[in-house]
Amino acid sequence: MELDHLFLCVGDRGRCGDLLAEFGLREGSGNRHEGQGTANRRFFFRNLMLEILWVEDEEEARSPLTAPMGLWERCGGEEGRSPFGIGLRVQDPEEVLPFPIWEFCPPYLGGRGCIRVGCGAGTEEPLVFCIPAGAGPYGERNASQPKAEVAGAGWVREVELRSKQGVPLSGPLEAVNGLAGFRAFRGDEDLLTLRLGPGPGTRRRCFAPALPLELRW
């Protein structure tokens, strides 16, 4: 089990992604998620994809199929709703995850399996899920996507995820906290920090409040 991608839910139909492009991050292709009601903009680092996610179809996002994901609430900017999602990947499709799950099988996966979603967490904390083996942004279909980098640094060395949630971390989030280079904790703001490059750097760029994202290199 390892990190595959991180999403940030936004309410402006992805326009805040322009901030990343204007900063100089190369952008990959976007997707429309049939049956899920969302669309995205994607930025591919060498080992991790950053996804700007928004709701395009309210009816699909609030349907009985998709509503349990909480994407409508997360992208609506409501106080107390976490905008973050943590996507995991596995090499072995039979690998048992270290937390209880339920299966989300949207049409856009085309029968290539289901997304395994962590149980026990509400929308006040990041959504933890595992994509089907081989179906994520680092599968063969996306091998030629342009890679994002900052000052030549394209490898995400550390991820810090700060959340304003007022509840203890759930089992799925605690399990992800055990991964090397990842740390989730409670704080006074929602903020995702990506540390790039081989060692500690002194430079930073914060895109808040438009986007709860900070890059350090």
Annotate each language-model stretch with its function.
Residues 28-34:
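Conserved catalytic-core motifs of GNAT/GCN5-like acyltransferases
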Residues 42:
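A cross-family detector of function-defining hotspots
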